[in-house]
């Protein structure tokens, strides 16, 4: 805020009002911290000592900031104090500040426990479990023991519980459920009572189902809410039809509303479940009124309204029938009773787990954060003289309890605070913004805030609600844009609160100069081309998703570069001037960390400096993956994947050809056996230089592995890890890699994790590796070690991580990221209010059925998800001070507009509830809201939007920009060194350098260096891994004789596109290419597949070929487009030829599609490389077919080349067949007697 700030009337009330409970609803940027500090100072002025206040903050950083601000404020008051008495007061308060109760609730609870531990007979000598991983490790250990205990009981009830939530492979599902249920229970003041209530929800009693509390309190209100939602759709349809003059459509919706009213009345009065079930299952709207003589536009509008609103209402009623009323009453009761038994057993198991976990923590003298809260509450509620004395002492001590970020508290924390609070009058001062409650995954309960928000506003309540609506952070365009979105999105139905006049942001940052640029932009990447693969490439299922992310990131980087390099301006609050944007002014916020690795790579490539504090998951970093692989093989070397990972890593340094060589020398058994076999059988005198080099590497590796394995048996895990660092030099090596400091910090962190593991009295490498693997499986990665923040770089963080922060320029990335609804598909749903809803798995039929409790829990989960995602979007938008950019991706502009136009005709300010609830990403919400503004017509003038009056009055400006692949293509070939700023900097350095004076001798030395030629320059351009087909394609005119002896002539001019053979310039990413028609290569591959799959019967018929081709298309091994191009007659003709008949005759001796790999010295393969060069090349390929007779082998290769002469086929493929022959003779130890090319196009065999 600007200097000379004056408090608003609402802020003044929040500072001065007293004698009651006060809830301050402080919108984003409203200065709530300033108000809290000023309230503390005001209390001190009134004679309250700072140690008589309890100030609870959400984080330790917030508590530290609060103390610092209070200290500054007290010093200011001291400097202006008139009397000695005042000065003494402020000096006394400054001296007490360090011991004042300004802390997180956990820190306050820890203080209570340390001071009053004797009340509950707690051993005061305990250590805090500050790491989540420590807690998880201990829980795993306790659960493993308890689970075995339950299994040994052979309890039928426990067996049913296991079967219901486990797979046929393991019981991880049950383990996860127990841990989550324990977590939910522990967020309550009385966990056992909450667990008991889980069971009581399933007790329907003996009365009819519709008389049960569950039906009356849960099902019936939900059913009526859904019917009302359908009715709201129909009413909106009536309004729209009426305004468009569609009389018959209006009449249709009018009669539909009447039908819905009848259904609503029936539900209210119905007393019998099966009657209601039958009514809903048979429910239909009456036939729509016929509407002739409409013009094209009216027809289009009618179709849209019917599809969106009438069909939507039908779907709502159908869902009621399917989800709630699928079963008759007796089956519902039976299902519920069986499910009750399972929930009862679950409750019992979780209670026992909680008791055992507590017992184990006491045994180890440790406490976790949950213990702090429960033990504090236990102390306060202990009904003994000591317990009652402690509670009264704390109540009398604190004249006021101030709670910051009140919306993020849970029921347990609320109970602790209200236990020591005064009742009449109240003395709680709670500050927060329920629109920023985004920690549902931590079991924060925004309902506590909402309940007070509504009740404190009523006239008959003694407590007070104060609203701080002014936003002193953002420019008017940002606040107006936020209001534009949320006034249409958020209400009690979808969002849990109304975004009304009380909730809207009020522009208060009047200190921005008028000339400060205004920007709010929506950037859409059109990903249509990115979902298409080139014709000769296999389809990767994740490809389109990855490239949507890449397209968004390139688009974002492009826009950021434009802002910085074009000198776009922002207002610098500290300097009080307008200046050009710098990278440090920009923050990228994302819903998840999923794309951080791509983001880091792309920004670096495009020359945009970036700081990503959590760029990748800790155990997904290269250095940690290598170390974990090493630890795995130290525990057990007979694991191929981690073994090869270590061998290939810098620790051992084997190349791909060396790895292949080891396997070729021993094709049976585990890979470690192949390594040992090579080492044990190595003969120095017969070894090539290649083998000798490999042997030396393996010898060092095996020596180190033996040493490490011996050390591991002594259970010295941390020492073992450090020994690996010392012996291999790996810690130093990663320090020299890009991001070396971060990598070294990560390796140090692994050492520290291992030390912590051992401190917990856990031993053994196997258990440590197993624990880490479990953590990764559950997506509970450890935190990455932190390093220094870059000075001038774009900051990247999650939206959750940005809460409480502000940035001049904000990019909300991946706004089309789908909300995570994966939990809804699990066989259980947990809810703090509704308990648990489960799916029941019939042990006999294996059929899974959702209980009514699961249906209710699902509805609640979706409602809470939508509300929390809405709040998350609010947090993201309100981080921006001056400029806001929202980034997303659609297939194309039409797809985006079609989704955004769904709600344009609604004249009410808030969009249709059903449409809002059905949305699964931020951008669809935002787009729907923007289309109703007149400004949007600049994007699409066909939008027939009904702009509500409030939106029209908003002083908002925004742009929507669409970027295609073509727009971004130039960005994909820009390297970071080619950025304009980098080039200018380098040129300036060169210009400032003084010219060097050199003598003749120095000149000759430099000249010799510059003119020298690397003797095997061609090898530098050659990959060590070659496909036979690539070798063939690399030469337009290979010398036949030299090919025969495997001396292939190198040509300096290599055809473009042979990028497997030559390490050429990088080609464009696949998403920058477009799909072309069916290629000959595709037809060739498909033809070979057909020949491979064809049964070798006595006679091959055309009908058989057609059936096989149809099957391959059905199995999606060949596309229908490619199948049309395959010439089946040519294949039939082949089997009537001499070669074809020989294949059929010797079908048991025929091998088809035979893969091979062999090592060939480069000097033998390439004619321009010296023959004595031992640099090996790994050649691999697939032989179409061979016939293995007693003492000879015939190899054959099908060719689908069109219009190619016999001589040209020989010229093109002789070398390839020679390589095949060499490979076959090496593998089978038999002479290849014939090498045959069969041309399907010519219909003849060509013997070489």
Swiss-Prot record:
ATP binds at residues 26-33. This is ATP-dependent helicase/nuclease subunit A. GO terms for biological process: double-strand break repair via homologous recombination. Belongs to the helicase family. AddA subfamily. PROSITE patterns: UVRD_HELICASE_ATP_BIND, UVRD_HELICASE_CTER. It comes from Ligilactobacillus salivarius (strain UCC118) (Lactobacillus salivarius). One of its GO terms (molecular function) is ATP binding. It catalyses: Couples ATP hydrolysis with the unwinding of duplex DNA by translocating in the 3'-5' direction; ATP + H2O = ADP + phosphate + H(+). Residues 5-475 form the UvrD-like helicase ATP-binding domain. The heterodimer acts as both an ATP-dependent DNA helicase and an ATP-dependent, dual-direction single-stranded exonuclease. Recognizes the chi site generating a DNA molecule suitable for the initiation of homologous recombination. The AddA nuclease domain is required for chi fragment generation; this subunit has the helicase and 3' -> 5' nuclease activities. Heterodimer of AddA and AddB/RexB. Residues 508-804 form the UvrD-like helicase C-terminal domain. GO terms for cellular component: cytosol; DNA helicase complex. Its cofactor is Mg(2+). InterPro entries: AddA, DNA_helicase_UvrD-like_C, DNA_helicase_UvrD/REP, P-loop_NTPase, PDDEXK-like_dom_sf, PDDEXK_AddAB-type, Restrct_endonuc-II-like, UvrD-like_ATP-bd.
